[in-house]
Amino acid sequence: MLQNTQEEASAICIRTLDNVPVAFLHYTEALSGTGKKAMKSSGASYAVPLANAETISADIRRAREQGAAVVVVSLNWGTSGTSKPTNAQRKLAQAIADAGADVIVGAGTRVVQPVTWLTHKNADGTAAQTLCAWSLGSLLNESRKDGNVAGMLLQLQISWDGQNISFGQVSYTPTYIWRQKVDGAYQYRVVASDQSAPNGMSEEQQGYMAKALRTIQNALADSPITIRTK
């Protein structure tokens, strides 16, 4: 997510969803050498918010001060192709939870990683939990590696009584990146891999889709999350 100005980079994104003010914060764990040089040469050090505990904690505090009842932190992080979070991810996630985030949503590894609850304490000393989805996998890309064609959409039910929030159902929709050739050119379509195959999908592609679903289910086997049923 690129920020065009310093003011834009400093602003907290808060959207009201079903009368609940929700803050959305996004950060990137690391940049390529090319990206770093581009930011330095342009003087736009604010263009890509980098993930560090101090910055994120400060932004969470500002979000709360501006009225956010729910804080969602999304991160591009981790090691591509790995099915488990790194120690650095775990350390940062716990710091984000301790700072008061309610949900952490990761991407960047290209493959689905587990979902877990992180425990921390509120300012008043009461216990609280943060939902952490380490990586949602791939929603859309050109790669045809097995894990890279699988992803998931996260669905959360969150209630707010004016003071505290509580989680209801935590579920997901597994997805598959279907590639087919039409008039000599490849077309890509994202489909729910737990549903019936769409018209025109070959038996071979149906087999790949079933394999993608198994990959997701294996990754989430011990996670507190279920496939969405409606």
Where in this protein do the model-derived segments appear?
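Acidic, metal/ion-coordinating pockets
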Residues: 1-230
